[in-house]
Amino acid sequence: FDFRNQLIKSELGDTLAYCYQCATCSGACPVAQVTEGRYNPRRLILDSLLGLKEKIFGPENAFNIWGCTMCDTCDEVCPQKVELTEIFIILKNMSVQRGEAPEHYTMQASTVLETGKAIPMQSAIERRRGQLGLPDVMAPDVEEVQKLLKATKLPEKLPKKEE
């Protein structure tokens, strides 16, 4: 139960122990509905309560954590006011520390770090904006974005690029 206690003692995970497994969160979760239960916040909370790291972490279990879109629906409907989204953030951060973040997340983060944007502007979009009379999209201040991301230690959390 060391893992469970670590979660409960964390700044954001102290409401974990309030969960009585009513499954209201899973019933309201849009991801659980779309994935026909493959993503299941109640199960993730249960595995956390039981300290079952092997069911939470590892490449084969990545969707268990990373399927959450942080919409906060589960937090809104929980009768015990368990801060599920905050607990899922803790689990995602642990996953990153273990080097288990899904590749598409780390690739997206690398793109933001390098360019200041999550999605680069495409010429077709620029043309269409011009046709609609919309102003040009301002380029981000890449140095400012990098400064902010370095303050959060993002570069240290990304996989090292092979040269």
PLM region descriptions:
Residues F1-E11, T35-I65, K81-I119:
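Ferredoxin-type iron-sulfur electron-transfer modules in oxidoreductases and energy-metabolism complexes
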Residues F1-T15, Q97-E163:
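Iron-sulfur (Fe-S) cluster-binding modules
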Residues F3, Y20, V31-A32, I45-D47, ...:
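Aromatic-residue detector
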